[in-house]
């Protein structure tokens, strides 16, 4: 489980396709603290560390590798990553820590596309559009005003939701410390809807 509070960027240093899977090798400041089998969220996707590498000619810093399977690649924006891209990362929560964001499972539901950006006296409003699918909405894939949503792994508060769009306000600190700084109109992002809404939607069907 995660909280949606991004620790830092990881930078993609290598991408290797292995049949239907893709191995991503990345570097960050705390590679030395990682271990094999550890769960780390990448743009909101929970992935398992499968290898840790010492500095080499390919990457002068320590690095680590995670593997994304086909279902993950089909559902998320990870398949769009290129070498040099920045990825939001967060290690799984400690059970004795504060939940500063909201409950994030690391199970991305679908992608959305940025359709508008608006300056708001120092902050920035991003508008995202996702698939208008009534069946998915019945499963809890929707947003509510002042509710929580996870965008590229970042826990955010929803503004001005419609049936398939919503806005989020990004303060300068979040812009500086996440890959929201790279989002433009047309950029594809990962969405995880609030698990509480999904459970309520499911209960209504029983």
Regions found by a protein language model. Give the residues of each.
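Conserved loop->alpha-helix
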Residues: 1-206
């Amino acid at each position: 489980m995660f909280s949606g509070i991004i620790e830092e960027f990881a930078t993609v240093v290598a991408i290797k396709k292995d049949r239907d899977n893709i191995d991503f090798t990345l570097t960050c400041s705390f590679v030395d603290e990682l271990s094999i089998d550890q769960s780390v969220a990448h743009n909101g996707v929970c992935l398992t560390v499968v290898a840790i590498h010492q500095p080499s000619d390919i990457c002068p810093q320590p690095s680590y590798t995670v593997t994304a399977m086909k279902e993950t690649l089909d559902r998320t924006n990870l398949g769009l990553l290129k070498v040099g891209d920045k990825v939001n990362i967060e290690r799984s929560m400690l059970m004795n820590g504060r939940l500063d964001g909201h409950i994030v499972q690391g199970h991305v539901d679908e992608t959305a596309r940025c359709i508008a950006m608006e300056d708001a006296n120092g902050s920035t409003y991003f508008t995202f559009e996702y698939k208008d699918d009534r069946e998915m909405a019945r499963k809890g894939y929707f947003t509510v005003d002042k509710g929580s949503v996870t965008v590229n792994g970042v826990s955010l508060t929803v503004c001005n939701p419609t049936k398939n769009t919503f806005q989020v306000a990004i303060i300068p600190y979040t812009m500086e410390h996440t890959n929201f700084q790279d989002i433009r109109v047309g950029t594809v992002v990962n969405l995880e809807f609030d698990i509480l809404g999904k459970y309520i939607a499911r209960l209504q069907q029983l």
